[in-house]
Amino acid sequence: MSQLDLNALNELPKVDRVLALAETNAQLETLTAEERVAWALENLPGEYVLSSSFGIQAAVSLHLVNQIRPDIPVILTDTGYLFPETYQFIDELTDKLKLNLKVYRAGESPAWQEARYGKLWEQGVEGIEKYNEINKVEPMNRALKELKAQTWFAGLRREQSGSRAHLPVLAIQRGVFKVLPIIDWDNRTVYQYLQKHGLKYHPLWDQGYLSVGDTHTTRKWEPGMAEEETRFFGLKRECGLHEG
């Protein structure tokens, strides 16, 4: 596998970009997660960033990437509506892993948004998408721009939802390379990694949460529910960061 030209790939239509990356992805599928990170750092352009929602299994990708690339900027888009346990988890992992945390927020405070738009998360799919655009997508776009990112690592896994089932290791999103080192990991592999490195699940894991986002759009798992049904009232899985 050789170095890839981001500018040249960005000039191609999306379908052609996927085809251009197909051979590289076929080879990346044969590598371990650690090897994928090392390959990306050697062959893809900097600056490098890692995004995290500090969700249930966030410690895995944070530890994995940070141990290979210490001080990599870790982007958190903070909506202001995270669980108290999430904010505590962020503090704990930032201290334990010595993370270079970069927090980005919407230009409007949560209270101001509610005054202007009402509770967007109660306004169906359209309201949720507007909420995500304001609180997730715009802050992430700003982060990528301000940090001059050209390669973005994230901890998505195919097993998490139908919308992620066919994602490749390497893609181009928002004009930058996006690398998903643990995309093919199952829950058992995640558990084994956490155990091996003395890491913890999010505190709400023990209370029956399989996925954690904002307090108003996250539900505990109940028998018969798919994991993706625990977010956004089952109306959608993605918050907008990993779409497009």
UniProtKB/Swiss-Prot annotation:
Entry GO terms, CC: cytoplasm
Gene Ontology terms: biological process: hydrogen sulfide biosynthetic process; sulfate assimilation, phosphoadenylyl sulfate reduction by phosphoadenylyl-sulfate reductase (thioredoxin)
Subcellular location: Cytoplasm
Annotated keywords: Cytoplasm, Oxidoreductase
EC nos: 1.8.4.8
Pathway linked to the protein: Sulfur metabolism; hydrogen sulfide biosynthesis; sulfite from sulfate: step 3/3
Catalytic function, reaction form: [thioredoxin]-disulfide + sulfite + adenosine 3',5'-bisphosphate + 2 H(+) = [thioredoxin]-dithiol + 3'-phosphoadenylyl sulfate
Domain of life: Bacteria
Residues at the active site: C239
Database matches in InterPro entries: PAPS/APS_Rdtase, PAPS_reduct_dom, PAPS_reductase_CysH, Rossmann-like_a/b/a_fold
Disulfide bonds: none
Pfam families linked to this entry: PAPS_reduct
Annotated GO MF terms: phosphoadenylyl-sulfate reductase (thioredoxin) activity
Top-level EC class: oxidoreductase
Primary subcellular site in the record, as a coarse category: cytoplasm
NCBIfam families, A to Z: cysH (TIGR00434), PAPS_reductase (TIGR02057), PRK02090.1 (NF002537)
Function of the protein: Catalyzes the formation of sulfite from phosphoadenosine 5'-phosphosulfate (PAPS) using thioredoxin as an electron donor.
Family membership: Belongs to the PAPS reductase family. CysH subfamily.
Protein name, per record: Phosphoadenosine 5'-phosphosulfate reductase
Species in which this protein is naturally found: Salmonella heidelberg (strain SL476)
